[in-house]
């Protein structure tokens, strides 16, 4: 497979936005705005959440089909080592729901799985410094 196609190379690809279909796009965008610190930009029934510095953009649009039973992908949010629990507590206070912790299974990461107000799973992860792995 070629490294470049029409002058584009793989290292030029970035994440443009994480898109979510929502029962209530404005409400869900409000939750994620509080999590990320971004300011929502509504446009009709959809809401765009621009990327904060070093972050990612999100786009919320009305659900077009029934919600699938299994979520095929999810966000992993990374926080500095030692701050995961405080961030989890903050997000639960914003409306997330605690699901489970994974703290001992992997030496290079600990995470907590949460659900946003519409039930979409996401994780808050922390990686220990290299000398503690």
Role assignments for model-derived ranges:
Residues 1-23, 40-42, 48-61, 66-90, 92-133:
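Vicinal oxygen chelate
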Residues 36, 44, 61-64, 68:
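A solvent-exposed interaction/effector surface
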Residues 25-44:
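N-terminal first-folded block
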